[in-house]
Every structure is written in C-alpha cells, then in structure tokens.
C-alpha cells in the first residue's frame, strides 16, 4: 500500500487533453475500455519526450479516435496546466505507480469532418463507444476524480463554445 506521504512526493505526468467540437457545437466523448468502464471522457494522452503539447494533442487525437489533423482546426488552448490527483487505489495500477496524477494542457478543436472519419477501433484501442454531447454535460459523464478538470476546461473555453 502506498502511504499518503509517498503519494505527495510523486510527480504529475505531463499530458494533453482535447475538447473536439463538431459542426453543431457538440463535444466528442468516448467510453473507456478498462478501469472505470462506465465512464466517458474526452481524448487525452501523454506527451512523449521531445514532443511539444500541440504535437502530442494531434498525435493522441489520431491514435485514439482515428481523426487526422487535416480534419480539425485548433481554436484555443489553456494558458497553464490543469492538474488532478488519482485516487489512491489507482496509483499503483497506472504508469507503474510513478505518478500521483496528471498535469494537462487542453486544446479546443473544431472537427469539420464527418462521423465516418472517426474510428475508435485503432491499433491500441482505448474506447468501446463514442458519441457527441452538449459541452455542459461533460462534467456529468466523467469519473468523479476528473470532474473539476472538466469544469475548468469548460471555463477556459467558454468564449468559444
């Protein structure tokens, strides 16, 4: 078992998150395959060494959703990092127990492709289903420990929604 003092000494994992809006202004969410399987989330993923946040965002978008960079436009990004803590029971299960949570740079993207451009059956699938929802509904569908992140993302992008 990991002690609270040990958790506090762990770093945050650098990560990007993507709010992808369709032509109707709805946000893309997908249902996780593993641990909180009933949870829906927006695409997100780690930043590889030597990669900047924008490059990571576009790479993760394609890896997780099949959406290619020629089908999106970046509209905005968060000014700073938004952090969240993992629940203690997940720390040892994710990323070899090396991180206490994640610090995320979020990007708002406009998707101008068609729904058939989306393919979650990727090389390393993370999702079992996807849908478009109203941005205001995002905090209701995410796991509780990420809810504050989604509220902060909505606030950061409110002028563009």
Annotated model-derived regions:
Residues 1-21, 96-97:
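Acidic, metal-coordinating catalytic segment for phosphate/diphosphate chemistry
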Residues 26-27:
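Entry beta-strands of beta-propeller and related beta-repeat scaffolds
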Residues 33, 46:
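Residue-level signal for short, function-critical loop segments
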Residues 35-38:
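A conserved beta-turn-beta hairpin within the catalytic core of GNAT-like acetyltransferases
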Residues 41-43:
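A short gly/proline-enriched turn/hairpin at secondary-structure junctions
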Residues 47-144:
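Unchanged
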Residues 135-161:
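Charged phosphate-binding loop/patch that engages nucleotide di/tri-phosphates or the phosphate backbone
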